[in-house]
């Protein structure tokens, strides 16, 4: 042995351990028996494992999650769960039962209150709250999974998977395990005998160790469908201001819309109000977006050139199949979503992100984490920030330059579009984000801020627009936020003279300053007033889920 050389070590411990576990499973081939899944998981998962469980925004590997919740905690315990979206009750049952201990995630939605309670009770430990692309990236660095539990529509007996319109996170999750000696188990709705019986192959069988036919089709949530009947006049007024005061003002051609009625109103005003302003062909041409049904009228009216999707949306399958020039589809005609690539597109390739939040402080820092609610962020921190690595220019990006300096770079538009008060008369604008105290109480190393104020270029409320990128300093920035914060404590902290000065300089605009009459913000401007109208716009191709049908 050479001087200083370390003793011989074993270089394939992960591979050897995987082989040991696979050998312990009494099956031939790659198909696990549906009725024996719990027992199989007890052989394939070991205490302390890092386990990826595919809960996505829409698609849920729910048969696998329900089965994981039934394993014996004496056999499987202290798991470190890595879940993009925590959306089902059994996702947290495993912590109450002691099967899992630590959680790294991005979004929790309906489980946000329960996560907060489990954290307070000491039954769950949070690693970090991530943005999606950040969580995927860590799978290839320090969160390399021992096991990945994922979902697909169909598989053949060799493990080839068809994930189709709901491909979503699956490729990113699977590759991290498959190429670092992790075990990959896929639940599917349908098992076929041969690859030729699959519409296409989205994940090759060599990446998959086992498939199991689920006891019922995997759960999928139409998370991004908004009923136009619920769009209020305030949403329409804000949408008018967005189109005229931001989209047209800065020539926004590529963009992402966050979820909500505010952005749904914008989509439904493009064929009407946008048309009145003569903006077709000048704005909103390229989208990174889930296939929002409320975008159908704009597509049919010729506004939209392309849409790349994070995930699918129930009921939109046949409409997408019939519009391959707009959507990304496979040779079989069905859409191919990909959240990792769409998040990258939303980070580097779009001019603007516009979305809502639950709280905004005086400097435009925002968060969806509030007292008693640990909801996570999803993709907003990724798309709602200015990536300093960007090197291509567009008119909107260049329009953010405020100084004639040859070394100045452009900036992504990041717009927080909120009403000054949430439901229940809770102010959106607050002196201090709840996230600060949540971090202290939970022992987090940093406050769970969704979008930092220095990335926010505009704040849009029913009062008006604050063009924050034009602020000369933090004091003026705070005054601009206050000028559109209404009668919240933040809004009452600025006097009328200062607001008048900001309006005179064009750093803050109210509807009247843009030639928008508040009385014009009526539902008659919406291109579709109901889900039935969206179906009609689609030529009958859109097939909305039952809960959105009123006929």
Predicted regions and their residues:
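Conserved alpha/beta enzyme-core scaffold
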Residues: 1-551
